[in-house]
Amino acid sequence: MARALLFSLVFLAILLPALAACPQNCHCHGDLQHVICDKVGLQKIPKVSETTKLLNLQRNNFPVLAANSFRTMPNLVSLHLQHCNIREVAAGAFRGLKQLIYLYLSHNDIRVLRAGAFDDLTELTYLYLDHNKVSELPRGLLSPLVNLFILQLNNNKIRELRAGAFQGAKDLRWLYLSENALSSLQPGSLDDVENLAKFHLDKNQLSSYPSAALSKLRVVEELKLSHNPLKSIPDNAFQSFGRYLETLWLDNTNLEKFSDAAFSGVTTLKHVHLDNNRLNQLPSSFPFDNLETLTLTNNPWKCTCQLRGLRRWLEAKASRPDATCSSPAKFKGQRIRDTDALRSCKSPTKRSKKAGRH
């Protein structure tokens, strides 16, 4: 009898995690592997089965995520905490979540991310922190995130990127910093994420192109700098990743000029957005060879022979942008692709291939 009772107790102990109850007012699926507690009035993190892999806690109220808030959920893969009025994430808040891949913290009131907030998240691949009030990234904050691939930090209040901000996140590929308050990227701030492929910096306050910081990047395919008061782009701006750059957004920047060698080393550019600026010329280094899309409208283009490369590109395209001349006066309002201003322009003398090799 005693042996039978002992066997029963052991059996129940083994099954207990799988038989744990679904939290009140929540919906559970797949033997409690998916727990949905969306907008159910929770004030504290509920207890769930150790077998739970997806926990959706959206639209509840957790002002502070304290240390060890999820320690009893070692098998979580996806954690949803959007719209939860979170103000602070304490050090060790996600301790124990060594299987977590997706973490959603979007649309909260997060102002403080303590160093150590992401400890133990060594498998985390997707981190969404957009639409919060984060003003700085403490050095070492991302150090545990050795597998991070996508980081969304858009729509926050970050003013500056300092050296070491992304320390440890060496595999980061997509970084979104749109709609912050960035006025500068310090030299060294991107040294730890040289493998970025997609980098969005639009709608910030960058008054000069951050050459020193960006020069550490090697494989950027898409760079978005729209809606920054840039005015000019310097020589060799994209050279360190010029063999990979395919899409460049520089619209709505009050851009007045490119330096002559701004596009030096750029060989694969396919899509460029330059509309709503103050440009009147394009540099001789502008890479038309592989270009598929070019937006040009609302710029005061000066229709002289310096635009002959643009004219040739426009003539070769079936779908062509409708940019017009602003000067000389007699050509004002004429489409660049049709104006007589460029008809007599001769092609520049090509340098020999031998002379052009490096």
UniProtKB/Swiss-Prot annotation:
Compositionally biased spans, kind Basic residues: 348-358
Signal peptide residues on this chain, from the entry's feature table: 1-20
Location(s), subcellular: Secreted, Extracellular space, Extracellular matrix
Tissues showing expression: Cartilage.
Gene Ontology BP terms: bone development; negative regulation of bone trabecula formation
Domain LRRNT: from-to ranges: 21-50
Disulfide bonds: 22-37, 303-345, 305-325
Pfam families the UniProt entry points to: LRR_8, LRRNT
InterPro entries tied to this protein: Cys-rich_flank_reg_C, Leu-rich_rpt, Leu-rich_rpt_typical-subtyp, LRR_dom_sf, LRR_TM_domain-containing, LRRNT
Record has Signal as a keyword: yes
Residues bearing carbohydrate: 143
SMART domains named among the record's database cross-references: LRR_TYP (SM00369), LRRCT (SM00082), LRRNT (SM00013)
Ranges where the record places region Disordered: 322-358
Superkingdom of origin: Eukaryota
LRR repeats: 51-72, 75-96, 99-120, 123-144, 147-168, 171-192, 195-216, 219-240, 244-265, 268-289
Residue ranges of domain LRRCT in the record: 299-347
Keywords from the UniProt entry: Disulfide bond, Extracellular matrix, Glycoprotein, Leucine-rich repeat, Repeat, Secreted, Signal
Cellular component terms per the entry's GO annotation: extracellular region
Subunit structure: Mostly monomeric. Interacts with collagen type II.
Its job: Promotes attachment of chondrocytes, fibroblasts, and osteoblasts. This binding is mediated (at least for chondrocytes and fibroblasts) by the integrin alpha(2)beta(1). May play an important role in the regulation of chondrocyte growth and proliferation.
Family, per entry: Belongs to the small leucine-rich proteoglycan (SLRP) family. SLRP class IV subfamily.
Protein name in the entry: Chondroadherin
